[in-house]
Regions:
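Terminal presequence/propeptide segments associated with secretion/organelle targeting
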Residues: 1-241
Length: 241
């Protein structure tokens, strides 16, 4: 909860070839009392770094709805790094075949009516789950000197101010210059973008038969998302849209 980072053990089960980007995924089973308490791998944990013997191997990106939520798919870090290699073209598609669901937290919409949220949901045509929630809205400050670490909760904003629209995920890796990778799957798969990156406060992990999810809200704008690609989102902390 809050800004706390926590860890949990997981075992590798298999390596699975994927029919679309990313081309390989690592099947894991999460274990431990924390995972049992929250009901498995939650949406919004996407981007959570996965280490083997202290080495960053990748990040949790996918799972299955209405299934065993302890099972998940890790996007290898070499696949995630491809987010930096795409040419600046918008709307690049990663492939049509899906055998899993991204662990993307719902798009939280605050400051508008349920009817307005339903319209936003229709506009996205099922690309992302839209959840209206009466969280406090208003001005979100900018943290020009934010220091984030792998495992921190982060978010992407589409709107902020009197109306807030955004999602919550997890930071996977960041270098000394502030270049980062997160989510381990696309946000909206829009290609070359300029979305605010936020530090997120996690209120609670909400249990669900479909898939548990992290309920978070933005604390401050800390950087910019420049790439929204099939393997990950990427951008720079300390730079802004």
């Amino acid at each position: 909860k809050g800004l706390e980072r926590v860890s949990f053990p997981a075992e590798v089960i298999s390596i699975i070839p994927s029919p679309s980007e990313p081309k390989r995924l690592i099947l894991i089973r999460a274990r431990g009392p924390l995972v049992e308490k929250i009901g498995g791998i939650a949406a919004g944990m996407s981007g959570s770094p996965f280490f083997i013997n202290g080495r960053l191997v990748g990040a949790i990106g996918y799972g299955w709805d209405f299934s065993d939520h302890n099972l998940g798919l890790v996007t290898p870090i070499e696949e995630m790094s491809k987010a930096w290699d795409w040419q600046a073209k918008k709307g690049i598609e990663g492939g049509k075949v899906k055998f899993h669901e991204s662990k993307n937290a719902p798009l939280i919409v605050s400051g508008i009516s349920s009817r307005g949220a339903e319209k936003i949901s229709r506009d996205f045509k099922g690309e992302v789950e839209v959840l209206p929630f009466d969280l406090p809205v208003g001005g979100i400050g900018v943290d020009y000197d934010a220091e984030l670490q792998p495992g921190d909760s982060v978010g992407v904003l589409l709107a902020w101010g009197d109306v807030s629209v955004g999602s919550t995920g997890t930071l996977t890796a960041v270098d000394v210059e502030g270049n980062f990778l997160a989510y381990a799957h696309p946000f909206l798969n829009r290609g070359d973008v300029s979305f605010p990156l936020t530090r997120s406060w996690v209120h609670e992990v909400i249990p669900s038969i479909k898939s548990p999810f992290k309920l978070g809200s933005p604390v401050s704008i800390v950087g910019v998302v420049r790439q929204d690609r099939p393997q990950a989102i990427a951008g720079k902390i300390g730079h802004f849209p």
